[in-house]
Amino acid sequence: MKAKLLVLLCTFTATYADTICIGYHANNSTDTVDTVLEKNVTVTHSVNLLEDSHNGKLCLLKGIAPLQLGNCSVAGWILGNPECESLISKESWSYIVETPNPENGTCYPGYFADYEELREQLSSVSSFERFEIFPKESSWPNHTVTGVSASCSHNGKSSFYRNLLWLTEKNGLYPNLSKSYVNNKEKEVLVLWGVHHPSNIGVQRAIYHTENAYVSVVSSHYSRRFTPEIAKRPKVRDQEGRINYYWTLLEPGDTIIFEANGNLIAPWYAFALSRGFESGIITSNAPMNECDAKCQTPQGAINSSLPFQNVHPVTIGECPKYVRSAKLRMVTGLRNIPSIQSRGLFGAIAGFIEGGWTGMIDGWYGYHHQNEQGSGYAADQKSTQNAINGITNKVNSVIEKMNTQFTAVGKEFNKLERRMENLNKKVDDGFLDIWTYNAELLVLLENERTLDFHDSNVKNLYEKVKSQLKNNAKEIGNGCFEFYHKCNNECMESVKNGTYDYPKYSEESKLNREKIDGVKLESMGVYQILAIYSTVASSLVLLVSLGAISFWMCSNGSLQCRICI
């Protein structure tokens, strides 16, 4: 019996066994990503795809300065408001900056026809050539060309637009006029003019000497006849009269003809336009700085190569796509679940089931071994490098596909087009929602695939070791194997590099396996003997207890015993 109890004790004092575990890298990263199935998954490595910062300044765009309109609007600049005279010399720019409420627009009150469309056209212009379409001194010999207005004063004196001429009577006459221009610039030419609408017939007679005036403007793509509307109007900038402003684009080789017998605000300067796909008009109060950037928004410049941004939907230059997302992070590493570094019954550190290894720093997947010569970590470089290459290519591919750099300028609508503007906003919002949904779904799917890819790689590494060891070792859980034979460092290395010699260790493993199986059988016999002894002893104790209770009850009369024959 003593011998059997000794065998039982031996089963609880198992001898040391060599082990090898398959696991993965872990670190102290707090990066979190979302997947299709989970949110806020902590991972070892990830890349951000969403730019959410800007410098708060207006910058040069690829070394080219913007055109800052200052206190002038686009209308004041292009018509030549005297207060915008400093802008006349500006002929090239990277983009145009207009403040939210500029003071200097049309100095003489009136309606600017198709102004929003003109802004849209100018938003794609990066430079122009300003030239005299009808020279002031020679084009109108029979008319006075010095018409001015107090509403367009400059330096305290009455003045007028720098790109238009107000033609009035000369020597008491206003002869019919006819003037034409042929576009020989090999570019589109922007031509602007106006029609004066006096407040009463007396002003009409005094300036133009006719009550039935007209203005006709004709080109291959434009034809319109204007009749002055003489009426008293509320004063604006101390003026009861109005000037309505018009424009057209003249194609190369085309001719524009002006005919009038009064009320014409004639073109003086026109503009040969050069288009630039990265130009645009933004409305901003941001300060100008000497910085240089590739992407500009009204809030500030963005210097980023990321595919998405949530700074502002209006952008100029090579800019990330605007989305409404608050977070777009793509996983490149593994789930970050550092294992509790405690040792189990066999001294093995938890493997890929319970968590990763912070001690393995030179790879994503690998091994931890323990034998008589010590213990240590080793990364599986081949599987790690293959994974890095695959994920890097995938991330680069996603960024390349989604990183469509472009300019997104705001669309222009006048006050009478609110329904169209609201409809446009709904359409834009719809597209923006689709873009945001597509971007978020893409990241969620790729994150799910990447984490599954890592899990698959760890499993494949585990199966690789298992197929080599076969029955020379046993699986003990947590991604670990316990050898049935001694496995020194050379042996461990052969398992890691796939050259493990199974036949070399099979005989030793067989003997040790049989010994362990014998101990198990002997232990089972001991358990059976103990079970029998325990049952018999328990029964005897129960019988003695019942007899004692019966004797006590009979002695005090609580229990009567009768024997009938």
Swiss-Prot record:
SUPFAM superfamilies: Influenza hemagglutinin (stalk) (SSF58064), Viral protein domain (SSF49818). It comes from Influenza A virus (strain A/China:Nanchang/11/1996 H1N1). Residues 18-528 are extracellular. Residues 550-565 are cytoplasmic. Keywords: Clathrin- and caveolin-independent endocytosis of virus by host, Clathrin-mediated endocytosis of virus by host, Disulfide bond, Fusion of virus membrane with host endosomal membrane, Fusion of virus membrane with host membrane, Glycoprotein, Hemagglutinin, Host cell membrane, Host membrane, Host-virus interaction, Lipoprotein, Membrane, Palmitate, Signal, Transmembrane, Transmembrane helix, Viral attachment to host cell, Viral envelope protein, Viral penetration into host cytoplasm, Virion, Virus endocytosis by host, Virus entry into host cell. Homotrimer of disulfide-linked HA1-HA2. Interacts with human CACNA1C. Binds to sialic acid-containing receptors on the cell surface, bringing about the attachment of the virus particle to the cell. This attachment induces virion internalization either through clathrin-dependent endocytosis or through clathrin- and caveolin-independent pathway. Plays a major role in the determination of host range restriction and virulence. Class I viral fusion protein. Responsible for penetration of the virus into the cell cytoplasm by mediating the fusion of the membrane of the endocytosed virus particle with the endosomal membrane. It comes from the Viruses. InterPro entries: Capsid_hemagglutn, Hemagglutn_HA1_a/b_dom_sf, Hemagglutn_influenz_A, Hemagglutn_influenz_A/B. Glycans are attached at N27, N28, N40, N71, N104, N142, N176, N303, N497. Its main location: virion. The record marks R343, G344 as: Cleavage. Major glycoprotein, comprises over 80% of the envelope proteins present in virus particle. GO terms for cellular component: host cell plasma membrane; membrane; viral envelope; virion membrane. It is found in: Virion membrane; Host apical cell membrane. A lipid is attached at C554, C561, C564 (S-palmitoyl cysteine). Residues 1-17 form the signal peptide. One of its GO terms (molecular function) is host cell surface receptor binding. Palmitoylated. Pfam families: Hemagglutinin. It is a single-pass type I membrane protein. This is Hemagglutinin. The chain crosses the membrane at residues 529-549. GO terms for biological process: clathrin-dependent endocytosis of virus by host cell; fusion of virus membrane with host endosome membrane; fusion of virus membrane with host plasma membrane; viral budding from plasma membrane; virion attachment to host cell. Disulfide bonds join C21-C480, C59-C291, C72-C84, C107-C152, C295-C319, C487-C491.
